[in-house]
A protein has these predicted regions:
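Amphipathic alpha-helical interaction segments
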Residues: 42-45, 167
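Conserved alpha-helical segments that form or flank metal/cofactor-binding pockets of metalloenzymes
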Residues: 44-84
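Alpha-helical bundle segments that constitute or directly flank the non-heme di-iron/ferroxidase center
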Residues: 1-24, 45-59, 104
Length: 211
């Protein structure tokens, strides 16, 4: 089963993976990512970690009401220490095979994704629609693709696919409205808004960040 979200997710991964190859990301693997103690090598490993979650997805129990995407991603912060520890462990485990290891994880993720036929699935944080689950994976790629770009200011081109940024910005706008009761003041261009929503840029808004 595949639809437009599947296509967009693959497009963003393909764009990001090509960018990582073009910039020879392993030359920069020890550079700080701007995300706590993570290096860019850790961030590469985290891409595989995030997409590999597709292999864990199952159909939600019959009658399960899907969560909104906003509620789902709002449950991320408590898990952050565990995710950080597991990501660093994965990066160390992959070692010099970092990119090949991530490629293998993504190949497994795509095979699993194509087998997901249920309209409501069960992710780590609860049930949500299949499309919204894929959107959480797209959000990861867009946010972290931008993290790579900001950590490498000498590289002009961004790895973020414009259509993917628009989709993620729209989803985060809906999540903001659900939380605050009003739409965000400004969401275009999409990347500055995504940085605010993801906590990459500080804001006095008490409803931010969203994840």
């Amino acid at each position: 089963m595949e639809d437009q979200m599947d296509v967009l997710l693959e497009r963003q991964w393909d764009g990001l993976r090509s960018w990582l190859a073009e910039v020879d990301i392993l030359r920069y693997r020890d550079r700080a990512s701007g995300l706590g103690t993570w290096t860019l090598g850790d961030l590469v490993a985290h891409l595989g970690y995030g997409l590999r979650m597709l292999t864990e997805v199952t159909a939600a129990p019959a009658g399960a009401a899907p969560m909104s995407l906003g509620r789902y991603v709002g449950a991320y912060p408590p898990a952050a220490p565990t995710i950080a520890e597991q990501t660093s462990g994965l990066a160390a485990e992959l070692g010099d095979d970092l990119l090949r290891g991530v490629d293998a994880m993504v190949a497994d993720a795509w095979r699993a994704r194509r087998q997901i036929s249920a309209s409501v699935v069960l992710g780590r944080r609860g049930p949500l629609t299949r499309d919204d689950y894929l959107l959480t994976r797209l959000l990861e790629l867009v946010v972290h693709g931008d993290d790579f770009h900001r950590a490498l200011p000498e590289i002009q081109a961004s790895p973020v696919v414009p259509d993917a940024a628009v989709a993620v910005a729209g989803a985060l706008s809906a999540a903001y409205e659900e939380r605050s009761g009003r739409p965000p003041t400004r969401t275009t261009p999409p990347l500055p808004w995504i940085r605010l929503a993801a906590g990459r840029v500080s804001s006095p808004d008490p409803h931010l960040p969203l994840l």
